[in-house]
Amino acid sequence: MNFSLSEEHEMIRKLVRDFAKHEVAPTAAERDEQERFDRELFREMANLGLTGIPWPEDYGGIGSDYLAYVIAVEELSKVCASTGVTLSAHISLCSWPLFAFGTEEQKTEYLTQLALGEKIGAFALTEAGSGSDAGSMKTTAERIGDDYVLNGSKVFITNGGVADIYIVFAVTDPEKKKKGVTAFIVEKDFEGFFTGKKEKKLGIRSSPTTEIMFEDCVVPASKRLGEEGEGFKIAMKTLDGGRNGIAAQAVGIAQGALDAALQYAKERKQFGKSIAEQQGIAFKLADMATMIEASRLLTYQAAWLESSGLPYGKASAMSKLMAGDTAMKVTTEAVQIFGGYGYTKDYPVERYMRDAKITQIYEGTQEIQRLVISRMLAD
């Protein structure tokens, strides 16, 4: 068993780390304060090939793998969790289902644009009345001739309002419940598609989260993803990989908080020596580092399994569960190490703490992860 990263993975880590340090970090606090999405940053990520990391060159990607992708999300999230989740949602939630379930025509048209970063992607599953219970959605799609007509709404859409392409799930046969859900590719310019309110959030504030609405939205049948009734399966398989993207985001947030806390602890003097030398602080730092490393290993393992074509659903759920809890614990401890300064916006740890909370909620709450894991253990 080899735990070393390949030369390619190390090269991608350095590339993204340098980009994050010089292009993302300088404006992270300002974008958070202003709740501002920076499309130019997305273009710069595209120019570096980050928007197509795991996809074949035939579809505009760079032909790497899912481990390279989670490394990129981790490095971005160390300085800005909003930028990390922008890439995660774009690749895991929009591009992946197209790659896995799209026709050749759909992949050539849409996956290529997404991989090249010419278009931004999003995923629309959650509704106001169906969060964890995705099978109870109310959005409908009625087949009329060569089109489907969608009616309903979705909430908490990452990249909402800035995305060009949405993977949308709607009910085509209410009698079949989960087996009556179908997936569609919806472009932002389709007639009857609207962006609703933008959420005011605790964290990841420069990542837009919006409602989207369908009012007799006409979607050509050629834009159906998979067969009728396969939507729920597509959604669940998509979330298997998406969870590991969020785990990578959580690891990045936690590492960023630890780096800041460690530097501060070395510089801050109390009672004649740095607080890093005080056992109470030193032990906190040791625990934080250990939790992060364990979470990182789980995340990389899940990515390796997916890249190797092996079952990865359980590993992905475990990585998100562990990394989400780690991010919340580590960022809270980082604020504590900073003391009163940690509670101010003069330092980034309060932002890390606010950003960490969402990793325990979206793409399946911690409770849902435990449910997924326990069911797989019982099989």
From Swiss-Prot:
Source domain of life: Bacteria
Induction annotation: Repressed by FadR in the absence of LCFAs (fatty acids of 14-20 carbon atoms). When LCFAs are present in the medium, they are converted to long-chain acyl-CoAs, which antagonize FadR as to its binding to fadR boxes on target DNA and thus derepress transcription.
Assigned keywords, A-Z: FAD, Fatty acid metabolism, Flavoprotein, Lipid degradation, Lipid metabolism, Oxidoreductase
UniProt cofactor(s): FAD
InterPro entries (alphabetical): Acyl-CoA_DH_CS, Acyl-CoA_Oxase/DH_mid-dom, Acyl-CoA_Oxase/DH_mid-dom_sf, AcylCo_DH-like_C, AcylCo_DH/oxidase_C, AcylCoA_DH/ox_N, AcylCoA_DH/ox_N_sf, AcylCoA_DH/oxidase_NM_dom_sf
Pathways per UniProt: Lipid metabolism; fatty acid beta-oxidation
GO molecular function ontology, one term from the record: acyl-CoA dehydrogenase activity
Record bears the keyword Acetylation: no
GO terms of biological process kind: fatty acid beta-oxidation
Catalytic activity of the protein: a 2,3-saturated acyl-CoA + A = a 2,3-dehydroacyl-CoA + AH2
The UniProt record lists the keyword Iron: no
Enzyme Commission number, as recorded: 1.3.99.-
UniProt-listed PANTHER family: ACYL-COA DEHYDROGENASE (PTHR43884:SF41)
Role of this protein: Involved in the degradation of long-chain fatty acids.
Family per similarity comment: Belongs to the acyl-CoA dehydrogenase family.
Protein name: Acyl-CoA dehydrogenase
Naturally occurring in which organism (per UniProt): Bacillus subtilis (strain 168)
